[in-house]
């Protein structure tokens, strides 16, 4: 069975402003997501599932989904603040979505095969989809054995400012032992560095694997996520800004010994429009890839 690509497209794009998922950056107005879908199809994926907010469904169907429907089956699910397990209600005053792993849970009703999870607004690159697609095709019928694409941190930096990245630690066999979210990572005087929680400057090696939220799971992940989400809600219901992130869930499963996560290396560079000032650079990078023959000028 071919794997499914699950696209997280419910985010607001707060730092950049506007619906950045719909921003045309390619030579014929292609979005970053168009390139991900194109790469996924040629990487062996057989279905798309988008998680979006109900409020922009019409726009999304007209501008985005209509392009793909003749190339690959497409389904849409919705992330909603009130979509909570039985016995829980959304606290008054909460506006922030419940986080990426809550968004992933929305796919439970429509996904029964190994699946990848990606952000809608990151350009992941051809090699990453080829590597992940191959791994997922070997995971059919398995349980508790997941994977993620580990980007080399030097291939993920923004020229317009610092970035936050999940810095990965691995064991000798290449399995994830933990992900630590680090903020304000940037290249200064040739060194990639960040400041840790003690105010100390830490230099990262160029090839240090980081998570760009490109994961590979099997359907049993939904069951674990549902159970842990209840624990998360009990502990965090009073915090209106708390979020249930994928790395939180993954770290818990690894720490408990419930599952293992293979870190897949990729030569791809990952980039996106973190800041409005990034936009032109992304346009130029995509054009360079088209000029080099990596992508056709018109995708769909």
Q: Which residues are covered by each model-predicted region?
A:
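Active-site metal-binding loops of divalent metal-dependent hydrolases
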Residues: 12, 122, 153
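Hydrophobic packing residues within well-ordered alpha-helices of enzyme cores
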Residues: 60-64, 132, 225, 282
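Long, low-complexity C-terminal extensions of enzymes
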Residues: 279-298
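Conserved N-terminal catalytic core of the sugar/cofactor nucleotidyltransferase
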Residues: 1-7, 27-117, 124-125, 129, ...
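A C-terminal functional module that forms or caps the active site or interfaces directly
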Residues: 226-259
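Conserved core of the sugar-phosphate nucleotidyltransferase
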Residues: 126-215, 219
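A phosphate-binding catalytic loop at a beta-strand-loop-alpha-helix junction
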Residues: 4-17
């Amino acid at each position: 069975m071919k794997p499914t690509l699950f696209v997280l497209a419910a985010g607001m794009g707060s730092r950049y402003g506007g619906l950045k998922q719909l921003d045309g950056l390619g030579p014929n107005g292609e979005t970053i997501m168009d390139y991900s879908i194109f790469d996924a199809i040629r990487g062996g994926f057989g279905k798309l599932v988008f998680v979006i907010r109900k409020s922009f469904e019409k726009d999304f169907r007209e501008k985005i989904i209509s392009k793909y429907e003749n190339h690959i089956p497409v389904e849409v699910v919705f992330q909603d603040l009130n979509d909570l397990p039985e016995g829980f209600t959304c606290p008054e005053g909460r506006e922030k979505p419940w986080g990426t792993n809550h968004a992933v849970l929305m796919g439970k009703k429509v996904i029964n095969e190994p699946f990848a999870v990606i952000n809608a607004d990151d350009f992941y690159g051809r090699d990453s989809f080829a590597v992940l697609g191959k791994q997922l095709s070997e995971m059919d019928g398995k349980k508790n054995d997941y994977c993620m694409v580990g980007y080399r941190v030097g291939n993920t930096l923004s020229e317009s400012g610092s970035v936050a990245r999940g810095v990965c630690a691995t064991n000798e066999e290449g399995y994830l032992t933990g992900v630590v979210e680090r903020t304000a990572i940037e290249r200064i005087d040739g060194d990639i560095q960040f400041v840790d929680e003690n105010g100390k400057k830490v230099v990262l090696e160029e090839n240090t694997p980081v998570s760009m939220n490109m994961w590979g799971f099997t359907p049993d992940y939904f069951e674990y996520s549902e159970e842990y989400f209840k624990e998360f809600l009990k502990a965090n219901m009073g915090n209106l800004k708390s979020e249930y992130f994928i790395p939180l869930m993954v770290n818990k499963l690894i720490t408990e010994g419930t599952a293992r996560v293979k870190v897949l290396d990729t030569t791809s560079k990952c980039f996106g429009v973190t800041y409005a000032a990034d936009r032109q650079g992304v346009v130029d990078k995509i054009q360079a890839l088209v000029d080099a023959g990596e992508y056709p000028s018109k995708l769909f």
